[in-house]
């Protein structure tokens, strides 16, 4: 990940100079590198980028959004299921090591929720929250609003599936929910007709007008 760190040094400085230093609405940083396991060099890379973000901005919060190497982590392959999916225990071991190395410069972790099966949500989410609490980090969920279970990549997710994921995050005591990706898969202005309906169901569920 050395090249990613080197490239982002310039990006971080440019973003702060052009936007962060000029606009009060700039509230923090998303460190956009995505990993799922204890990738070689990842701890050092995230620590370096997180520290630079905080140094230039006077300590504004930072977050990352990794994915879980679960059954549905098959992008870039011809497989239907990842037969080398990480176990809950191994996930806990590897992310304990990662959090231990980055928690002083990364404030929150928003694990993507779409690569594991629905019957695994509680087990993985409980571990994620436990680890975040251990290291004084916030635990968010990145609720994917597209469906990985369809033969077409990708369509807006059925609301019942999105609800299951959000309710699992609530049971685990997560601090916040974000989504990927609203504009394509949940916005009433999306080219997908289903996206507007998903937004309507979301508003109904939460009593929003």
Residue ranges and their predicted role:
Residues 1-209:
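Glycan-processing catalytic domains of CAZymes
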